[in-house]
From Swiss-Prot:
Catalyzes the condensation reaction of fatty acid synthesis by the addition to an acyl acceptor of two carbons from malonyl-ACP. Catalyzes the first condensation reaction which initiates fatty acid synthesis and may therefore play a role in governing the total rate of fatty acid production. Possesses both acetoacetyl-ACP synthase and acetyl transacylase activities. Its substrate specificity determines the biosynthesis of branched-chain and/or straight-chain of fatty acids. Pathway: Lipid metabolism; fatty acid biosynthesis. It catalyses: malonyl-[ACP] + acetyl-CoA + H(+) = 3-oxobutanoyl-[ACP] + CO2 + CoA. Residues 247-251 are annotated as: ACP-binding. The gene is fabH. Belongs to the thiolase-like superfamily. FabH family. One of its GO terms (molecular function) is beta-ketoacyl-acyl-carrier-protein synthase III activity. It is found in: Cytoplasm. Homodimer. It comes from Ehrlichia ruminantium (strain Welgevonden). One of its GO terms (biological process) is fatty acid biosynthetic process. This is Beta-ketoacyl-[acyl-carrier-protein] synthase III.
Length: 319
């Protein structure tokens, strides 16, 4: 039976580093206030002439290099993003062009912070069905372009960046992407959204959020989804090496760990370095875990994310 395995991981953060102290010069906040409530210490901001596709390409190049896969062997490119270069064409087709992956078909997926999990599920199913052998799965965002920089409740939370993985056909049993579960609840769409839209008013708008309610849903839904995927695969928390949750807020990660009795040392934490990068969050955290020597071959990993929509998802992977 066909399955897909992560062969390579890559990440990219733009050059401009903005610390909490930098933000304190423009809005009523402080490093202490931000760190205590979010765990965020800094974020990276894309240059004015830097597009989502540019960052996606840099992350993809590193993932391809890490995998040893030739770009001409890529059959599919899926880009998870909320902030594409343009309304159309898709960011993925621009990435395909810049990478010169001439044999790949490409499209975007929009599930905001859950986007990378959704993209993984889609690419995994294409591989399992036999339609493709190699897929690039990318999460990339320029969240800074949809922020109100005078609103301290949102502008301190987000950053820009990109992460990518190479998924390839794998014949070994119980390795690679073992299981994925996706969820949506559109009745909660008004908890987190932008004030604009192509059809709505013709502008991108800025992020609007009911932070308290989103926080509560994140803890509840991430916890429940992790329990479900472990039960589905007859696994215990003790058997999992790493839990990589969406890097939105350190308190969410800590409270999920406490609720499920997950040892803190099993939680991958990178939010302090790059803030909430939406769809790029999970691959950035994976890249951090690998580069820091935490993530090893054959490790069992749970990936889980929640985002606007509301959408959420969980993925069980054997590295």
């Amino acid at each position: 039976m066909r399955s897909s395995r992560i062969l390579g991981i890559g990440s990219y953060l733009p050059k401009s580093l903005v610390t909490n102290d930098d933000l304190a010069c423009t809005v009523a906040t402080s490093d202490e206030w931000i760190v205590k409530r979010t765990g965020i210490r800094q974020r990276y901001i894309a240059a004015d002439d830097q597009m989502t596709s540019d960052m996606a390409v840099e992350a993809a190049k590193l993932a391809l290099n890490d995998s040893g896969i030739n770009k001409q062997d890529v059959d599919l490119i899926v880009v998870a993003t909320t902030t594409p270069d343009r309304t159309f064409p898709s960011c993925a087709t621009i990435v395909q062009s810049k990478l010169e992956c001439k044999n790949a078909f490409a499209f975007d997926i929009q599930a905001v912070c859950s986007g990378f999990i959704y993209a993984m599920a889609i690419a995994d199913n294409f591989i399992k069905s036999g339609q493709v052998n190699v897929s690039l799965v990318i999460g990339a965002e320029v969240m800074s372009r949809i922020l109100d920089w005078k609103d301290r409740s949102t502008c301190v939370l987000f950053g820009d960046g990109a992460g990518a993985v190479v998924l390839s056909n794998n014949s070994a049993r119980n390795t690679g992407v073992i299981s994925t579960i996706l969820y949506s609840d559109g009745t909660l769409h008004n908890l987190l959204y932008t004030s604009g839209g192509t059809a709505y008013n013709g502008v991108a708008g800025t992020i609007c959020m009911n932070g308290t309610v989103v926080f509560e849903h994140a803890i509840e839904k991430l916890s429940a989804s992790i329990v479900e995927i472990l039960n589905k695969n007859n696994l215990s928390i003790d058997e999992v090496n790493w839990f990589v949750l969406h890097q939105a807020n350190i308190r969410i990660i800590e409270l999920v760990a406490r609720r499920l009795k997950i040892p803190s040392e099993k939680m991958v934490i990178s939010i302090n370095q790059h803030a909430n990068t939406s769809a790029a969050s999970i691959p950035l955290a994976l890249s951090y875990a690998k580069n820091s020597g935490k993530l090893k071959q054959d490790d069992l990993v749970v990936l889980a994310a929640i985002g606007a929509g509301i959408t959420w998802g969980v993925c069980l992977v054997r590295m």
